């Protein structure tokens, strides 16, 4: 493949004079390019919605969401995966981020790590990939061998696969059941896909993980009601969530949370139904953890 033909590798005619610009104009040019990203992502929303439903289906069937990528794309997957346990109260390992070259590549580039299809397959084998898992391949270029190898192995293993790329009709898109391709155009700095392409991928990942967790019962209204209250800030947030969801006072909310070990969902259910902590937990379990269903039935 001639990489120079990729949209993400071409030169941007709006930024040909970066090195001659005064700083205010320099940052203005970057900002003007960034405004294009949301529209590019908007054009992919039907495919993002399919990916959200596939991710939720994977979780409901006992599977995992597995991101894999190289460089910036890999780091973004690891970032999104690492935020899921504290935000949604899910166990570590339910959402996984793989980066070509292993964990060391998060901090320092591992040259050549992305060029092996076999490495992508091997990393999934090491995770004991199961057919109920969802594998999301991330590559701004859309042609990273590590990701192609992983997606190919995942499909052969019976997994649903998603490809996120910033070039149209990319090789990884052809390897996946669902292709999400926000075409953000040439980067302000030629070929530096940590810029618009990275922003677009982050926006897509935000929707996939958050949307899947909504469908998995981890959200009530727009509150992260399965959040783990592990520090002072989060204990305060837990109290505010109970107050906002129920209309009770702060002191009463704190008293309920102390009875639930600061778990928000049973505290809200207790406040709105009069159940005790044990009964609230039992009712939530009967509705697979969906707070709205527990309140309505």
Swiss-Prot record:
<dbReference type="GO" id="GO:0046348">
    <property type="term" value="P:amino sugar catabolic process"/>
</dbReference>
<dbReference type="InterPro" id="IPR001347">
    <property type="entry name" value="SIS_dom"/>
</dbReference>
<comment type="pathway">
    <text>Amino-sugar metabolism; N-acetylmuramate degradation.</text>
</comment>
<keyword id="KW-0119">Carbohydrate metabolism</keyword>
<feature type="domain" description="SIS">
    <location>
        <begin position="55"/>
        <end position="218"/>
    </location>
</feature>
<dbReference type="GO" id="GO:0009254">
    <property type="term" value="P:peptidoglycan turnover"/>
</dbReference>
<comment type="subunit">
    <text>Homodimer.</text>
</comment>
<dbReference type="GO" id="GO:0016803">
    <property type="term" value="F:ether hydrolase activity"/>
</dbReference>
<dbReference type="InterPro" id="IPR046348">
    <property type="entry name" value="SIS_dom_sf"/>
</dbReference>
<comment type="function">
    <text>Specifically catalyzes the cleavage of the D-lactyl ether substituent of MurNAc 6-phosphate, producing GlcNAc 6-phosphate and D-lactate. Together with AnmK, is also required for the utilization of anhydro-N-acetylmuramic acid (anhMurNAc) either imported from the medium or derived from its own cell wall murein, and thus plays a role in cell wall recycling.</text>
</comment>
<dbReference type="GO" id="GO:0097175">
    <property type="term" value="P:1,6-anhydro-N-acetyl-beta-muramic acid catabolic process"/>
</dbReference>
<dbReference type="Pfam" id="PF22645">
    <property type="entry name" value="GKRP_SIS_N"/>
</dbReference>
<feature type="active site">
    <location>
        <position position="114"/>
    </location>
</feature>
<dbReference type="GO" id="GO:0016835">
    <property type="term" value="F:carbon-oxygen lyase activity"/>
</dbReference>
<keyword id="KW-0456">Lyase</keyword>
<dbReference type="GO" id="GO:0097173">
    <property type="term" value="P:N-acetylmuramic acid catabolic process"/>
</dbReference>
<comment type="pathway">
    <text>Amino-sugar metabolism; 1,6-anhydro-N-acetylmuramate degradation.</text>
</comment>
<dbReference type="GO" id="GO:0097367">
    <property type="term" value="F:carbohydrate derivative binding"/>
</dbReference>
<feature type="active site" description="Proton donor">
    <location>
        <position position="83"/>
    </location>
</feature>
<dbReference type="InterPro" id="IPR005488">
    <property type="entry name" value="Etherase_MurQ"/>
</dbReference>
<dbReference type="InterPro" id="IPR040190">
    <property type="entry name" value="MURQ/GCKR"/>
</dbReference>
<dbReference type="InterPro" id="IPR005486">
    <property type="entry name" value="Glucokinase_regulatory_CS"/>
</dbReference>
<comment type="similarity">
    <text>Belongs to the GCKR-like family. MurNAc-6-P etherase subfamily.</text>
</comment>
<protein>
    <recommendedName>
        <fullName>N-acetylmuramic acid 6-phosphate etherase</fullName>
        <ecNumber>4.2.1.126</ecNumber>
    </recommendedName>
</protein>
